Swiss-Prot record:
Keywords: Acetylation, Cytoplasm, Exonuclease, Hydrolase, Magnesium, Metal-binding, Nonsense-mediated mRNA decay, Nuclease, Nucleus, Phosphoprotein, RNA-binding. It catalyses: Exonucleolytic cleavage of poly(A) to 5'-AMP. InterPro entries: CAF1_poly(A)_ribonucleases (IPR051181), Nucleotide-bd_a/b_plait_sf (IPR012677), PARN_R3H (IPR034042), PolyA-riboNase_RNA-binding (IPR014789), R3H_dom (IPR001374), R3H_dom_sf (IPR036867), RBD_domain_sf (IPR035979), RNase_CAF1 (IPR006941). The gene is Parn. The record marks K319 as: Interaction with poly(A). This is Poly(A)-specific ribonuclease PARN. SUPFAM superfamilies: R3H domain, Ribonuclease H-like, RNA-binding domain, RBD. Residues 171-238 form the R3H domain. It comes from the Eukaryota. The modification N6-acetyllysine is found at K213, K492. Belongs to the CAF1 family. 3'-exoribonuclease that has a preference for poly(A) tails of mRNAs, thereby efficiently degrading poly(A) tails. Exonucleolytic degradation of the poly(A) tail is often the first step in the decay of eukaryotic mRNAs and is also used to silence certain maternal mRNAs translationally during oocyte maturation and early embryonic development. Interacts with both the 3'-end poly(A) tail and the 5'-end cap structure during degradation, the interaction with the cap structure being required for an efficient degradation of poly(A) tails.
Length: 624
C-alpha cells in the first residue's frame, strides 16, 4: 500500500492495526546517498573495527535523507498454514510544519539518485507528497512553543491590566488599527473584519493591544493566504462563542502538531510493540531511522548500542543469518535478490504467503527491487525460509518456526558489517569480537600509488589481501603472520613508504586519543582557541608525505595484476556492493548522555523482552 502525505492520516489506523496484529516486521529504506566524502570502498574498509565503522557511517552517511521507508507486517494463519502480509511503502520528506519548525538540510549523491531514477523511482512523490516527521527533541520544542503561546494568550488577563508599551515608530500603525476596529464595532452589518497583512511584531502588538482594550466581545485569530501572507481576522462574538472558538483553535493546533510528528508515529508504534524487526544488511537502516525519527546519533558506539536496543529491542539481519552456519556452505551469494532466489530451491522450502484483503500483492517474478516496500517484503520471505530450514533440522522436524522461537535467538541484535574480513557483525547486546590481526600491516605511501604498486611491493610474500583506507594508506593482510616482522624491517630505510604492524598502528592511534583527551581534561580551551588546531603525536594513517617523487624506481606489476584498473576506477556503487559482497570477500570495500537514554526508555513503553538463554542447536560464531 502506497502511503503519501495526502492519505497518511486516513490510513494510519490500518498501519497501527497491522503493527498490533503482526508476529514480526520486515523493514527497508531508500536513501538520497551513501557517502558524502570517501568512496563506498573506503567507507567499508576490510579491517574496520565496529567503532571505526560506526564513526565512518555517522560522519559520512547521516546527512543523507531516508526518503522511502518500507514496512511489511507478517502474521501466521494457523488455520490455513500460511503467512498473511500487509505491506506499506511510505514516502517521507521533512516539510516544515511552521516558520518556527526545523528547516532540515540534507545532501544528495548523484550516483544514488541516478541509480534510483533508473529503477523508476518517483522523486515527485518524495518532494511534493512526502510525509513530514519530527524527531523527539523537535517535537518537544514545538510543543513547548505551543504551550508557551497558549499560556501567553490565556495570560492576557495579566497583560490586560496595564496598557501595552508601543514603540514610537509603530504608534501610527496601531492607532489606525484601533480606528478600524472602532468603526467595525459600531457597524451592525459586519460580523468580521480582515486587517491587512503585517509583520509578526506588528501582529503581536495588535494582540496585546486588543487584549487590553477589548477584553470581551471579540475573537482575534491569524489566518494565512494561499500566498503565505499572514493577516489578522477579528470577529464579533459573545463569551460562549469566544470560548468555543478558542477550543476549536486548540484542537486544530493539536491536530497540526500530530500531523507534524507525522511518520515518526509509525516508528514509535513499531518500537513500542517490542516485536522482532527484520532487515537485510540493516545497519544503515537502523542508524538512519534512529537519527531521523528519534534523535541525533551519539558520538560513542556503546551509547548507540543502548539507544538501538531501547528503540528496537529485537533486531535480526538476514544477511548475517545467510552468512552463518548452517547457511554459509549452501548460500553463495547473500545479496537480497540472489538470496530470495536461492531460498526457493532445495534444500529450502518457500513459505506460503498471501496478502491481506485490501492490500496489493507483490510478485517476486517482477523483481520490483529498490522499492522499499517490496524489498521489505522479500526480506521477510528470506527470514521465514531460513528460520523454517533451521526447524527442519530438528528431531522431530518443525516445519514452521515462529519469530519468538529460541532457534533464531542467536541472531538477535547482531548487525552485519559489510566487507569486514574478520568481524562479521556489530553486537548490540555486548562487546564486539576482537580478532587477532597479527598478520595485518598498515602501509602509508604517496597518493600516486595504485593497487598494482602494493602488489609489487609485497610480491615476495605470496598471497595478500589489500584493504584501502584512503589515498595514502591501506591495510595489507599477509598469509603467514611470521612474515610480518620481515616486511616491517624491509621498510626501515625506505623513503617513499612506511610499514608498521597493526598493533603499532592501533597503539599510536590510542596514544593520539589520550593526548587529545588530556587537552580537554586540562581545560586548555583558551590556548586552543587562540591558535590553529594542532594535532597530538598520533600517527595518522593519512599523514605520511613522501620526501620526493618516485624518482627512478620502475614499477613492474606482477603479471597476475597486469589487468588491474587504477585505484580511482575501483569505486563501486552501493548497488554493485550489494550484488557482490560477502563477509569473506577480499575486495576492499550532538552527543546524547545516559540521561537522555533513560528518558527515552521511560518514554518508550517497550513491550517484549529478549531472552538471555542461548539456543542450543545453532550459534553465531565468536570467531569467523
Amino acid at each position: 500500500m502506497e502511503i503519501i502525505r495526502s492519505n497518511f492520516k486516513i490510513n494510519l489506523h490500518k498501519v497501527y492495526q497491522a503493527i498490533e496484529e503482526a508476529d514480526f516486521f520486515a523493514i527497508d529504506g531508500e536513501f538520497s546517498g551513501i557517502s558524502d566524502g570517501p568512496s563506498v570502498t573506503a567507507l567499508t574498509s576490510g579491517f574496520d573495527t565496529p567503532e571505526e565503522r560506526y564513526q565512518k557511517l555517522k560522519k559520512h552517511s547521516m546527512d543523507f535523507l531516508l526518503f522511502q521507508f518500507g514496512l511489511c507486517a507478517f502474521k501466521y494463519d494457523h488455520t490455513d498454514s500460511k503467512h498473511v502480509t500487509k505491506s506499506f511503502n511510505f514516502y517521507v520528506f521533512p516539510k516544515p510544519f511552521s516558520r518556527s519548525s526545523p528547516d532540515v538540510k540534507f545532501v544528495c549523491q548523484s550516483s544514488s539518485i541516478d541509480f534510483l531514477a533508473s529503477q523508476g523511482f518517483d522523486f515527485n512523490k518524495v518532494f511534493c507528497s512526502g510525509i513530514p516527521y519530527l524527531n523527539q527533541e523537535e517535537e518537544r520544542q514545538l510543543r513547548e512553543q505551543f504551550d508557551e503561546k497558549r499560556s501567553q494568550a490565556n495570560g492576557a488577563g495579566a497583560l490586560a491590566k496595564c496598557p501595552v508599551t508601543i514603540p514610537e515608530d509603530q504608534k501610527k500603525f496601531i492607532d489606525q488599527v484601533i480606528e478600524k476596529i472602532e468603526d467595525f464595532l459600531q457597524s451592525e452589518e459586519k460580523r468580521s473584519l480582515e486587517l491587512d497583512p503585517c509583520t509578526g511584531f506588528q501582529r503581536k502588538l495588535i494582540y496585546q493591544t486588543l487584549s487590553w482594550k477589548y477584553p470581551k466581545g471579540i475573537h482575534v485569530e491569524t489566518l494565512e493566504t494561499d500566498k503565505k501572507e499572514r493577516h489578522i481576522v477579528i470577529s464579533k462574538v459573545d463569551e460562549e462563542e469566544r470560548k468555543r472558538r478558542e477550543q476549536e483553535k486548540y484542537t486544530k493546533e493539536q491536530e497540526e502538531l500530530n500531523d507534524a510528528v507525522g511518520f515518526s508515529r509509525v516508528i514509535h508504534a513499531i518500537a513500542n510493540s517490542g516485536k522482532l524487526v527484520v532487515g537485510h544488511n540493516m545497519l544503515l537502516d537502523v542508524m538512519h531511522t534512529i537519527h531521523q525519527f528519534y534523535c541525533p546519533l551519539p558520538a560513542d558506539l556503546n551509547e548507540f548500542k543502548e539507544m538501538a536496543i531501547c528503540v528496537f529491542p529485537r533486531l535480526l539481519d538476514t544477511k548475517l543469518m545467510a552468512s552463518t552456519q548452517p547457511f554459509k556452505d549452501i548460500i553463495n551469494n547473500t545479496s537480497l535478490a540472489e538470496l530470495e532466489k536461492r531460498l526457493k530451491e532445495t534444500p529450502f522450502d518457500p513459505p506460503k504467503v498471501e496478502s491481506a484483503e485490501g492490500f496489493p500483492s507483490y510478485d517476486t517474478a517482477s523483481e520490483q527491487l529498490h522499492e522499499a516496500g517490496y524489498d521489505a517484503y522479500i526480506t521477510g520471505l528470506c527470514f521465514i525460509s531460513m528460520a523454517n530450514y533451521l526447524g527442519s533440522l530438528l528431531s522431530p522436524p518443525k516445519m514452521c518456526v515462529s519469530a519468538r522461537s529460541k532457534l533464531i535467538e542467536p541472531f538477535f541484535n547482531k548487525l552485519f558489517l559489510m566487507r569486514v574480513m574478520d568481524i562479521p557483525y556489530l553486537n548490540l547486546e555486548g562487546p564486539d569480537l576482537q580478532p587477532k590481526r597479527d598478520h595485518v600491516l598498515h602501509v602509508t605511501f604517496p597518493k600516486e600509488w595504485k593497487t598494482s604498486d602494493l602488489y609489487q611491493l609485497f610480491s615476495a610474500f605470496g598471497n595478500i589481501q589489500i584493504s584501502w583506507i584512503d589515498d595514502t594508506s591501506a591495510f595489507v593482510s599477509l598469509s603467514q603472520p611470521e612474515q610480518v616482522q620481515i616486511a616491517v624491517n624491509t621498510s626501515k630505510y625506505a623513503e617513499s613508504y612506511r610499514i608498521q604492524t597493526y598493533a603499532e598502528y592501533v597503539g599510536k592511534k590510542q596514544e593520539g586519543k589520550q593526548v587529545k583527551r588530556k587537552w580537554t581534561e586540562d581545560s586548555w580551551k583558551e590556548v586552543d582557541r587562540k591558535r590553529p588546531h594542532m594535532q597530538g603525536p598520533c600517527y595518522h594513517s593519512n599523514s605520511f608525505t613522501a620526501a620526493g617523487v618516485l624518482g627512478k624506481r620502475t614499477l613492474s606489476p606482477d603479471p597476475r595484476e597486469a589487468a588491474l584498473e587504477d585505484r580511482e576506477s575501483e569505486e563501486v556503487s552501493d548497488s554493485e556492493l550489494e550484488q557482490t559482497d560477502s563477509c569473506t570477500d577480499p575486495l576492499p570495500e550532538g552527543r546524547k548522555k545516559s540521561k537522555k537514554l533513560k528518558r527515552m526508555k521511560k518514554e518508550l513503553s517497550l513491550a517484549g523482552s529478549v531472552s538471555d538463554s542461548p539456543a542450543v542447536l545453532f550459534e553465531v560464531p565468536d570467531t569467523w
